[in-house]
Design a protein with these regions (language model features):
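Conserved phosphate-handling catalytic cores of large alpha/beta enzymes
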Residues: 144-205
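Phosphate-handling DNA/RNA-contact segment within nucleic-acid enzymes
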Residues: 5-155, 159, 172-173
Length: 205
C-alpha cells in the first residue's frame, strides 16, 4: 500500500541512507518538473512487487483505488483522471519486456503442468493463484514479447491466453497467439463469459 503522500517513501528511504538520485534511478521517485527535488511515484495505490525469476524484487506496479467515506484523513479519494495502473519505468534492473509477473512463484507448476495461463493484470494473476491455477503469469501492462515467450518455452509446450474480454483484450489475444506460434507453442484461448476479466470470473464463481 502506498499512502496518499508526495514524500512518504522518499523520506523513509532517505532515513535508510539512500540519496534522492538513487531513489529516482530505482524508478520509485520522479524528478520535479519545476525546481529541484523528487517526489513519490506511487501515491494512494495498492502495490504489487515485481520479482525477477529468482524472486528478487526489481520493480513495482500500483493500482489506484478510491477510499470509502470515513477512512483515515491522510488518505483521500483518487483523481479519476489518473491511470488505473502505473509501473516502475525502465531501470538498470527492470526491463518490462523480459519480466512476467509471478513467474518466480509459478515456474515450477508451469513445468509440472506443461502449460501456462497468460493473463493481463496483477489482480487477474493473484485471483487465479488463489483459485488454484498456480501456473498463471501476467504480462502486466505490456504487449507479450519474444523474450517472455522464450522464458515460457523452456518450461512448457502449451500457452493458454486468458486476457480481458474487451476490445483491447481480444486484440492482445490475437497478437499473443500469433507470436506464440513462432515459438511452436500449442495454443489455447480461455473464453470467459461471466465477467470482463479473469479476476471478475474468479470472484463470481
Amino acid at each position: 500500500f502506498a499512502p496518499q503522500s508526495w514524500d512518504f517513501l522518499l523520506n523513509a528511504l532517505i532515513k535508510k541512507g539512500f540519496t534522492k538520485e538513487e531513489i529516482e534511478h530505482a524508478g520509485i521517485a520522479i524528478k520535479k518538473q519545476e525546481g529541484p527535488g523528487v517526489y513519490d511515484r506511487f501515491r494512494s495505490r495498492i502495490m504489487f512487487p515485481i520479482a525477477d525469476s529468482s524472486g528478487r524484487i526489481i520493480g513495482f506496479g500500483g493500482r489506484i483505488f478510491s477510499v470509502p467515506s470515513g477512512a483515515a484523513s491522510q488518505v483521500v479519494p483518487t483523481d479519476k483522471t489518473e491511470a488505473k495502473y502505473i509501473n516502475t519505468p525502465q531501470t538498470m534492473i527492470y526491463d518490462k519486456s523480459s519480466v512476467l509477473y509471478a513467474f518466480d512463484v509459478a515456474k515450477q507448476d508451469i513445468r509440472a503442468q506443461n502449460k501456462v495461463v497468460l493473463v493481463e493484470g496483477y489482480m487477474d494473476c493473484v485471483m487465479s493463484h488463489q483459485a488454484g491455477v498456480t501456473y498463471t503469469v501476467a504480462v502486466s501492462g505490456t504487449a507479450l514479447t519474444p523474450r517472455q515467450l522464450q522464458m515460457l518455452r523452456r518450461l512448457c509446450d502449451m500457452i493458454i491466453s486468458s486476457f480481458d474480454t474487451d476490445a483491447a483484450g481480444e486484440s492482445a489475444t490475437r497478437r499473443s497467439l500469433a507470436l506464440a506460434s513462432e515459438f511452436d507453442f500449442e495454443r489455447r484461448v480461455a473464453h470467459i463469459h461471466t465477467g470482463k476479466d479473469p479476476a471478475d470470473a474468479v470472484l463470481e464463481n
